[in-house]
Amino acid sequence: MISMLAMAAMVSCTNEIENPDQPQVNQNEPTPIEFGSSILAVQTKAAKTGTAFSDNEIIGIIGFKGDAAPNADYSSPFMDNISFTYATNKFATTNASAVWERNATHHFYAYYPLATTTETNGYKYTAGTASVAPTVSVTVQTGEEGVKQDLLWSNLTSKKFTGASTEFSADKMKLQFAHKLARIAFKVVKKDENVPESALKAVSFKVDYKDASLNLITGELTKGSQITDANKISLSKTLTTAETITEDGSGNATCGDFSPIIIPGTAISDLTLTINEQTLTVSDLSTLTFKEGDITTVTITVNSKGVEFSAAITDWTSTGAGTGTVE
């Protein structure tokens, strides 16, 4: 009996993970990496409501290990564009590479929406190399939405993993995302009660930047080449039922909440409105500016002679660099 117990004890002592640096849960499982999140925003994502993700939304994460964050060689992440899915207030993955390593500092770079090496809905991921950081490229699509999904970015550096999983749980590892693109919105109003009854049917304009690239390590967005007049991207929305234009106040005409996402630094041109079946052009748009994380709302006032405009800029995000927090 004693020899059998001794043998059982020997077996139990060898039932461990081969890599002694990998942390353990219940002595035989690695500790998975999970994240909490928030979005620095008044309005957020393509849906333009809320400051949190919805269940089943997916982000991409690149992860490196080392005392210092990567700044030259980006070719060997331990997590290479791993998809994390949001559910029950946290992001998690089943990918086997997403586990903590004992006594290592981990550096994470996250973005939304998840992209692959094949362009989909205007997004494309390019892995890092020995000298170039990983990137996500974004392309404005012709039509109503511009960029189809809001581009968000965050980074986070952990302290060295000690093996105490409660210190590194999702509610402690929070990714705070920041918006990397810009938005334009429209509000059409009558100057006063003397303007005849009017209805808004459509809004159309063109943009001079089609694409941009986000450095996933630094969070810096770089615009592509400026487009010539002949090749500018047209964005527009036409309503099935025209909206009644009222004096400024509640219930303003917005062309069905037409608010496309565009590249920061874009200049718009050829802004036209269809009002009472007439096409009206808004001129002198050079004063409009579009910055990362901002909504520029263009108020177009209909008067007895035509239209005039003004603009106001509001934060799409709170001020912030999109960095993560470890609590």
Q: Which residues does each predicted region cover?
A:
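Sec-type signal peptide cleavage vicinity
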Residues: 1-327
